[in-house]
């Protein structure tokens, strides 16, 4: 079994005293300055990895408010799909699509040692940038732009002042609300076992950046792509509680000009985007959902998405305004709009996630959480039960969604799949399958079980009792109009 190289970073902490300063993420009232010092070492019994720019596992040690913190991170190997691609356009409008190597990337997930409720989403591309939770509080870390310095700022999520304090809203409804329920810290919010149990679903995502995003990033396509990667890395953490696994299939950048009319009218723009996706994007890229990100200021909104439309070729879409210099805020907004696609409506004041506002809050406020409420969980469960969108049933890729095996350290493993041993990276004994429409609780469903309901004059598809995928009914015609998009095959454990 391959061992990973552990890297410990000792951070000297110097609290900043004085008035607020402007960081890249906005005006911050108070932050601590930390200076990373990289120390490498191997745990007992570990073998040195082949040379990589970014280690599979890293640790950072520092202090927050005088409290020592050990941050354990593991590379997010489920971030990119197997055939991940990037698309941009030449000045004459010609499409250019490439498949860049992404195995040795710089995006991590993790936790804080001795805090079971903690989580983290960090990029190490250019310094440390991202968020982590500690004792129910959310902290952000980002590099300070100081010449010849490796200093970073660490500050609380709510300490970041936004330039525009006016409420920002989602366009699905125009209902403002403020929670009048007692606020509980996230560490005190315990979901029931029923709430915590969701069958896994797999969303292959495409992010499309319009030309305003290119202009906003000074025509730097690399910087724009990195921004999108950070957003998706955050979204994956947010959807983990629903057992939804998001993989990024493609980033499309309209570098030579918009391919639709992008205006301040979110409904009009989204309608055009959905039509473009149905006639263009679905024929080029295998995916389940597409999100448009724009720097155009939408009319009194920051996002808009269709409700309960996952897998629909035209309506499995949403639009998000790039409204913040903090990627966590933008990620929460995009997660919100995708939540609509997955059947979740806006939260009411009876909904609870342990914060003043949850992901599906109708408005975004300074204290908005990146967690789904109990109401959202119930609405998602109802949507999956009644609609069961077929395109997200099957795992797109097995090898990239299981972490490199790690032992003799405290790093978290990918343990969300009960059919798979995350420590040995081997199938559990006596199990038939890992996932798929004909796989349930690690066993093949019985022959004759319906795995795809008929629509109109079509015929049902049935499990054969031998595979985890849903075999096409041989008595169907040559073309089944409902077979879009073609689902990926499930993973069978041999």
UniProtKB/Swiss-Prot annotation:
<keyword id="KW-0482">Metalloprotease</keyword>
<feature type="short sequence motif" description="Cell attachment site">
    <location>
        <begin position="455"/>
        <end position="457"/>
    </location>
</feature>
<dbReference type="GO" id="GO:0046872">
    <property type="term" value="F:metal ion binding"/>
</dbReference>
<keyword id="KW-1199">Hemostasis impairing toxin</keyword>
<dbReference type="InterPro" id="IPR001590">
    <property type="entry name" value="Peptidase_M12B"/>
</dbReference>
<keyword id="KW-0800">Toxin</keyword>
<feature type="disulfide bond">
    <location>
        <begin position="439"/>
        <end position="468"/>
    </location>
</feature>
<dbReference type="InterPro" id="IPR002870">
    <property type="entry name" value="Peptidase_M12B_N"/>
</dbReference>
<dbReference type="Pfam" id="PF01562">
    <property type="entry name" value="Pep_M12B_propep"/>
</dbReference>
<feature type="binding site">
    <location>
        <position position="340"/>
    </location>
    <ligand>
        <name>Zn(2+)</name>
    </ligand>
</feature>
<feature type="binding site">
    <location>
        <position position="346"/>
    </location>
    <ligand>
        <name>Zn(2+)</name>
    </ligand>
</feature>
<feature type="propeptide">
    <location>
        <begin position="21"/>
        <end position="193"/>
    </location>
</feature>
<feature type="propeptide">
    <location>
        <begin position="482"/>
        <end position="494"/>
    </location>
</feature>
<dbReference type="InterPro" id="IPR024079">
    <property type="entry name" value="MetalloPept_cat_dom_sf"/>
</dbReference>
<dbReference type="Pfam" id="PF01421">
    <property type="entry name" value="Reprolysin"/>
</dbReference>
<feature type="disulfide bond">
    <location>
        <begin position="433"/>
        <end position="442"/>
    </location>
</feature>
<feature type="disulfide bond">
    <location>
        <begin position="353"/>
        <end position="358"/>
    </location>
</feature>
<feature type="disulfide bond">
    <location>
        <begin position="438"/>
        <end position="463"/>
    </location>
</feature>
<feature type="signal peptide">
    <location>
        <begin position="1"/>
        <end position="20"/>
    </location>
</feature>
<keyword id="KW-0378">Hydrolase</keyword>
<feature type="disulfide bond">
    <location>
        <begin position="451"/>
        <end position="470"/>
    </location>
</feature>
<keyword id="KW-0732">Signal</keyword>
<feature type="disulfide bond">
    <location>
        <begin position="311"/>
        <end position="391"/>
    </location>
</feature>
<protein>
    <recommendedName>
        <fullName>Zinc metalloproteinase/disintegrin</fullName>
        <ecNumber>3.4.24.-</ecNumber>
    </recommendedName>
</protein>
<feature type="binding site">
    <location>
        <position position="336"/>
    </location>
    <ligand>
        <name>Zn(2+)</name>
    </ligand>
</feature>
<comment type="subunit">
    <text>Monomer (disintegrin).</text>
</comment>
<dbReference type="GO" id="GO:0005886">
    <property type="term" value="C:plasma membrane"/>
</dbReference>
<feature type="propeptide">
    <location>
        <begin position="410"/>
        <end position="431"/>
    </location>
</feature>
<dbReference type="GO" id="GO:0006508">
    <property type="term" value="P:proteolysis"/>
</dbReference>
<dbReference type="InterPro" id="IPR018358">
    <property type="entry name" value="Disintegrin_CS"/>
</dbReference>
<keyword id="KW-0865">Zymogen</keyword>
<keyword id="KW-0964">Secreted</keyword>
<dbReference type="GO" id="GO:0004222">
    <property type="term" value="F:metalloendopeptidase activity"/>
</dbReference>
<keyword id="KW-1217">Cell adhesion impairing toxin</keyword>
<dbReference type="InterPro" id="IPR034027">
    <property type="entry name" value="Reprolysin_adamalysin"/>
</dbReference>
<feature type="active site">
    <location>
        <position position="337"/>
    </location>
</feature>
<keyword id="KW-0479">Metal-binding</keyword>
<keyword id="KW-1201">Platelet aggregation inhibiting toxin</keyword>
<dbReference type="GO" id="GO:0005576">
    <property type="term" value="C:extracellular region"/>
</dbReference>
<dbReference type="InterPro" id="IPR001762">
    <property type="entry name" value="Disintegrin_dom"/>
</dbReference>
<dbReference type="GO" id="GO:0090729">
    <property type="term" value="F:toxin activity"/>
</dbReference>
<keyword id="KW-1015">Disulfide bond</keyword>
């Amino acid at each position: 079994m391959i061992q990973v190289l552990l890297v410990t970073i000792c951070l000297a902490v110097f609290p900043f005293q004085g008035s607020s300063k402007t960081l890249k993420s906005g005006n911050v009232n108070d932050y601590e300055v930390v200076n990373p010092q990289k120390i490498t070492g191997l745990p007992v019994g570990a073998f040195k990895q082949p040379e990589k720019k970014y280690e599979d596992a890293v640790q950072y040690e520092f202090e927050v408010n005088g409290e020592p913190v050990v941050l354990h991170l593991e590379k997010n190997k489920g971030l990119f799909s197997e055939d991940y691609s990037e698309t941009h356009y030449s000045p004459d409008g010609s499409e250019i699509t490439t498949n860049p190597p992404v195995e040795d990337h710089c995006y991590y997930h993790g936790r804080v040692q001795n805090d079971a409720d903690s989580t983290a989403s960090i990029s190490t591309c250019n310094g440390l940038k991202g968020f982590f939770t500690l004792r129910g509080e959310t902290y952000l870390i980002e590099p300070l732009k100081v010449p010849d310095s490796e200093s970073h700022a660490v500050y609380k999520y709510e300490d970041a002042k936004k330039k525009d304090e006016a409420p920002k809203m989602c366009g699905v409804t125009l209902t403002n609300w403020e929670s009048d329920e007692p606020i509980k810290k996230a560490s005190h919010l315990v979901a029931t076992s029923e709430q915590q149990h969701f069958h896994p679903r797999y969303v292959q995502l495409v992010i499309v950046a319009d030309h305003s995003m290119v202009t906003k990033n000074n025509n730097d396509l690399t910087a724009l792509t990195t921004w999108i990667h950070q957003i998706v890395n955050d979204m994956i953490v947010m959807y983990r509680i629903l057992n939804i696994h998001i993989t990024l299939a493609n980033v499309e950048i309209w570098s030579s000009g918009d391919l639709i009319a992008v205006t301040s009218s979110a409904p009009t723009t989204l309608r055009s985007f959905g039509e473009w996706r149905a006639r263009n994007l679905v024929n080029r890229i295998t995916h389940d959902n597409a999100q448009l990100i724009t720097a155009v200021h939408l009319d009194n909104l920051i996002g808009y998405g269709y409700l309960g439309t996952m897998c629909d070729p035209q309506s499995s879409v949403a639009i998000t305004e790039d409204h913040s210099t903090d990627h966590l805020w933008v990620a929460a907004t995009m997660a919100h709009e995708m939540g609509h696609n997955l059947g979740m409506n806006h939260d009411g004041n009876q909904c609870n996630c342990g914060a003043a506002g949850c992901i599906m809050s109708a408005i975004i406020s300074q204290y908005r959480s990146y967690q789904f409420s109990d109401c959202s969980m119930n609405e998602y469960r109802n949507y999956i039960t009644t609609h069961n969108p077929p395109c997200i049933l099957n795992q797109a890729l097995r090898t990239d969604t299981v972490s490199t095996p790690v032992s003799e350290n405290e790093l978290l493993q990918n343990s969300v799949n009960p059919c798979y041993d995350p420590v040995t990276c081997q199938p559990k004994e006596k199990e038939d399958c890992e996932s798929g429409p004909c796989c349930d609780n690690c066993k093949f469903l019985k022959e004759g079980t319906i795995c795809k309901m008929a629509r109109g004059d079509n015929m049902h598809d049935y499990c054969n009792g031998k595979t985890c995928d849903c075999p096409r009914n041989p008595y169907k015609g040559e073309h089944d109009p409902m077979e879009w998009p073609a689902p990926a095959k499930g993973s069978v454990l041999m």
